[in-house]
Amino acid sequence: KNGTADHLDIVRAGNEKVLRARLADANFFYEEDLKEPLAEKVPALKKVVFQENLGTVYDKVERLGVLAEFLGKVLNAGEQDLKYARRAAYLAKADLVTNMVYEFPELQGYMGREYAERTGEEKAVALAIYEHYLPRFAGDDLPSSLPGQILSISDKIDNITGCFAIGIQPSGSQDPYALRRQALGICHIILEGQFDLSLEHLVEAAYRCYEGKVELKLSLEKVQEDIAEFFKQRLKGIFSDRGFSYDTVDAVLAPGFQNFSDTLLRVQALADFRQDPAFDDLLTVYTRANNLAKKATAFRPDPSLLQESSEEKLYQAL
């Protein structure tokens, strides 16, 4: 309320009236939604557009199932976790067609978890349904369960790959599909879980799910290249936030990257080595050799001039 403190009882009564009405609506939606199991709502997703050029949300659910299977095997998930991930992938988007989420979109995921538990799904499945939206914003919780991690990565890489494949990429301040946030989410989940996961293979798996079903504007190779660069920029920010110097990070990422956890280990290794007194000596030697190499003219070595066996072995090795 703006203004004076006069007539607060009237203001309170008005607010309570509005709040009671909204709570009554929410209770009605909740009871209506529970009249059928969450799984029975999935076919209705065939009528919900995911993205105008990428099919329906039901199509996305099918892709999530394929990606969850792929990731589960790559990450060596046990059969039980893989079972939970498969089921959660099928149910992940079902709450989008519930009365509650239609009226309160910000409750997606929350209601999926609640309805899954209330209609007999395993708690691990319900948790994964909720966790697949995590992290929702910077500093948010990460998925705590392996099925949740699998489903979260699957959901986000599907969004990113699909958008890139039809030519939709963030530019400047424009990022209508929140692809930067989703890429950061993938990075944090993989790094936190220390997963041995190749971005190249992950993007290929996601791309293959679209192939032959929608019209893609870019080739797999181009999409992999663009997404690798996109993720490289996200990793630069993450490593910088962890206290690594920009030149250390740039040096490691300069040749490109594919494996998230391996890249972090290399950044840490280089940062540690830079504290070693031998690093400066090595850098001096390399700089001199590099400068000489820039000035050198091209030539072909003549193996007939080699005299020592060690020279011949070195020549063969090179």
Would you name each region that the model predicts?
Residues 1-318:
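Amphipathic alpha-helical "coupling" segments that flank catalytic cores
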